[in-house]
């Protein structure tokens, strides 16, 4: 196990194209960090620099307080699990898992001991003689993880390891990775674009945006107090509703196109009064037929136990997430107009109109 640190890490490609603009972060011994963000945000580049597959343009990466910028990947004592399993098709499961150890010339008895121990953890004991073509997608990914485990590295790196699996298998493998970390307690860095993976696996999340860590915190910290409109719109499914509003000195709120919101002034903090800001409301923290604003229903998504009601309020689209039982009590159809608003039990979110950052103190 080990600590992992980033000190003003930057990456620029040929042609002076910046990808990582300066990352500072400390990963504690045994911590599971998930880097999440949209395509092109720099999350995989950051991981590849840790692995030694990309050079660091500026700054330092430290493993156990040792700068590793110039070390070869094999010298960093890390193990990486990729999106593609990258198994040797002509080798058995045992030989795939043992290959890296054979290259390092470990004794045969030690190799067998490590492979069999990893196979027991991953429930691969009965599959060690099979070739990859005889395995399911989930089994192949477990073999790839086993190949990393047997190395007994200081740091595990996971680069979107579940992206090629179907939805049901992804859920199962998330649980496998969670149990694996609890058992091994190895420092881990996990990259994904899937916020569900990030929320369920992470001790702390790093939300990346345009090459910069936009917010670092526990999953609930990021969900409950997003640092910016980007984070608010990225974390959460459906994402947070964001309305451009003008707040009067008396706490009365109007949308940017002049629609009055029937919200109690008591719910409007002093820091935003007399200002133009962005107001955020989580879809699950809103109610149909509640005080707020009128919305014309444009679409209804039926998800079994839940309904997603999409409504238009002037130029803004708003989504309400409610139970099917609650929805059945509101005989609304596409084209109908009804009032929607906050449930009064959860605070509203407020962001600066110009920067998108969360209003200080809120």
Curated annotation (Swiss-Prot):
Coiled coil segments of this chain: none
Keywords: ATP-binding, Cell inner membrane, Cell membrane, Membrane, Nucleotide-binding, Sugar transport, Translocase, Transport
Residue sites binding ATP per the record: 37-44
Pfam families: ABC_tran, OB_MalK
EC assignment: 7.6.2.10
Membrane topology category: Peripheral membrane protein
Top EC group: translocase
InterPro entries with a match to the protein in the record: AAA+_ATPase (IPR003593), ABC_transporter-like_ATP-bd (IPR003439), ABC_transporter-like_CS (IPR017871), ABC_transpr_MalK-like (IPR015855), ABC_transpr_MalK/UgpC-like (IPR047641), Mo/tungstate-bd_C_term_dom (IPR008995), NA-bd_OB-fold (IPR012340), OB_MalK-like (IPR040582)
Record has Lipid biosynthesis as a keyword: no
Domain annotation ABC transporter: ranges: 4-235
GO cellular component, one term: ATP-binding cassette (ABC) transporter complex, substrate-binding subunit-containing
A biological-process GO annotation: glycerophosphodiester transmembrane transport
CDD domains linked to this entry: ABC_MalK_N
Location of this chain's protein in the cell: Cell inner membrane
Reactions catalysed, as given in the entry: sn-glycerol 3-phosphate(out) + ATP + H2O = sn-glycerol 3-phosphate(in) + ADP + phosphate + H(+)
Molecular function in Gene Ontology: ABC-type glycerol-3-phosphate transporter activity; ATP binding; ATP hydrolysis activity
Similarity section: Belongs to the ABC transporter superfamily. sn-glycerol-3-phosphate importer (TC 3.A.1.1.3) family.
Function per UniProt: Part of the ABC transporter complex UgpBAEC involved in sn-glycerol-3-phosphate (G3P) import. Responsible for energy coupling to the transport system.
The protein's assembly and partners: The complex is composed of two ATP-binding proteins (UgpC), two transmembrane proteins (UgpA and UgpE) and a solute-binding protein (UgpB).
Protein name (database record): sn-glycerol-3-phosphate import ATP-binding protein UgpC
Organism in which the protein naturally occurs: Bordetella parapertussis (strain 12822 / ATCC BAA-587 / NCTC 13253)
Gene: ugpC
